[in-house]
Curated annotation (Swiss-Prot):
The lineage of its organism: Eukaryota, Metazoa, Ecdysozoa, Arthropoda, Myriapoda. The keyword Ion transport does not apply. It is found in: Secreted. Transmembrane segments: none annotated. It comes from Ethmostigmus rubripes. Residues 1-22 form the signal peptide. This is U-scoloptoxin(17)-Er2a.
Length: 151
């Protein structure tokens, strides 16, 4: 369960980094990371309004606030159906391929987080080699220049 939170904290912290790359947002990317961050940032800021960059705990709290982390049978699971709905309107290109990748990686409504996210981001990288979000996810957290977008 701890690795669950670590993976998602890294995912969303890496997404925050993508804001600094906004000038290149359409350079091979498939997912508009700026739009994704704009959606999740209020939930994260509600948990930790003065923390920059937001800690893993703040990001985890934000995911719970957004309704993406749910508890089932005592285990915390990631709701990929809800994540798919949140991606609507935030995909720049290859929309069908992105949704197909999500379905291939998670065939149920709730899936274990770490293997599903690894699968999804590997598939996105294959389809969108210029997508910086997936490249950032492979970087060690300590090497990322994390910052929170201004509200």
């Amino acid at each position: 369960m701890k690795s669950f939170f670590v993976v998602f904290a890294i995912v969303f912290q890496a997404t925050l980094v993508a804001l600094s790359l906004a000038a290149d947002a359409d350079d091979g990317q498939c997912i508009n990371t700026t739009a994704v961050v704009e959606y999740f940032n209020p939930f994260i800021q509600e948990c930790c309004p003065n923390e920059e960059p937001p800690s893993r705990d703040c990001v985890t709290c934000g995911l719970k606030g957004a309704g993406l982390v749910v508890t089932e049978d005592g285990k915390e699971m990631f709701d990929f159906d809800k994540y798919r709905r949140k991606l609507r309107g935030r995909i720049i290109r290859n929309e069908r391929l992105i949704y197909r990748s999500l379905r291939e990686c998670c065939r149920r409504r709730l899936c274990e987080a770490e293997p599903t996210f690894t699968c999804f981001h590997d598939k996105v990288k294959e389809q969108c080699p210029g997508d910086r979000t997936t490249s950032l996810l492979r970087s060690p957290l300590k090497d990322l220049p994390l910052r929170s977008p201004s509200c």
